[in-house]
């Protein structure tokens, strides 16, 4: 196997300096377009590939953003990734996608890997088990922008993009009450009750009941697994109620 082409090979072929080749490859404003095109064509001909990590270390930018989600096979997170990429790609950025599978240790490993890759920013949705905030503080200490999506931590210096889950749950429950419903089930996911968005939804549901003088019934809170079988079990449980519910508040 032949050695990889270098900027010196390009320089030798074009009879110019390696410094000129480097400036052309990095789109230096003082390099003519004619030289840039010539260098790029020769680089392609010789099979030259830039060392992106070395370039990132030199320039301080990698033009990559790390995106961490619990699972990419969940439609909600898939749509988030698609939206992020649609916004970043036209601006010259690429994304590195990581999954945690709601495992805090894997979350830490992902963050360390992204920081080592010199990403220009990290967008993340925390795991249901996230307790140690020090890894996120490390991101901020390195002056790497941090954005939480959907699930978040309240950290100074970090940004977040979330929905008002309390209001959404309240309005959904109120709508059912306005339709005459009084026994309304609420589904929540096993192991996620401490995650902010799920707590907010339960509180919104509970507040709507309270505001309409409907007593809270713990039996109507259904804890399910976060998969299709969990949904099937919930449906069967609803059908098996002796005093069957007349309204159901679900979410994906």
What are these regions (language model features)?
Residues 130-140:
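Active-site-adjacent beta->alpha loops and helix N-cap segments on the catalytic face
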Residues 45, 86-91, 112-115, 140-148, ...:
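Bacterial carbohydrate/catabolite-sensing allosteric modules
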Residues 1-63, 76:
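N-terminal helix-turn-helix DNA-binding module of bacterial transcription factors
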Residues 46-121, 190-192, 202-206, 210, ...:
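Amphipathic helical "hinge" segments at domain boundaries
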Residues 101-104, 127-131:
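Short beta->alpha connector loops
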């Amino acid at each position: 196997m032949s050695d990889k082409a270098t900027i010196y090979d390009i320089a030798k072929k074009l009879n110019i300096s390696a410094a000129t080749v480097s400036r052309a490859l990095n789109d230096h404003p003082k390099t003519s377009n004619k030289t840039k095109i010539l260098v790029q064509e020769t680089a392609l001909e010789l099979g030259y590939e830039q060392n992106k990590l070395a370039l990132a270390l030199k320039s301080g930018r990698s033009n990559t953003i790390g995106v961490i989600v619990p699972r990419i096979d969940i439609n909600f997170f898939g749509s988030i990734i698609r939206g992020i990429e649609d916004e970043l790609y036209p601006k010259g950025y690429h994304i590195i996608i990581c999954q945690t599978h709601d495992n805090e240790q894997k979350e830490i490993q992902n963050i360390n890997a992204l920081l080592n890759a010199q990403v220009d920013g990290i967008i993340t949705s925390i795991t249901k088990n996230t307790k140690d905030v020090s890894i996120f503080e490390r991101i901020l200490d390195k002056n790497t922008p941090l954005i939480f999506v959907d699930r978040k931590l309240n950290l100074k210096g970090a940004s977040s993009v979330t929905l008002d889950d309390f209001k959404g749950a309240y309005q959904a429950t109120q709508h059912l009450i306005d339709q005459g419903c009084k026994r309304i089930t609420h589904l929540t996911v096993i192991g996620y009750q401490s995650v902010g968005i799920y707590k907010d939804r339960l509180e919104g549901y509970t507040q709507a009941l309270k505001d309409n003088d409907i007593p809270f019934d713990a039996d109507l809170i259904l804890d399910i697994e976060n998969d299709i079988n969990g949904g099937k079990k919930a449906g069967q449980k609803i059908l098996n109620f002796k005093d069957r519910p007349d309204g159901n508040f679900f979410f994906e």
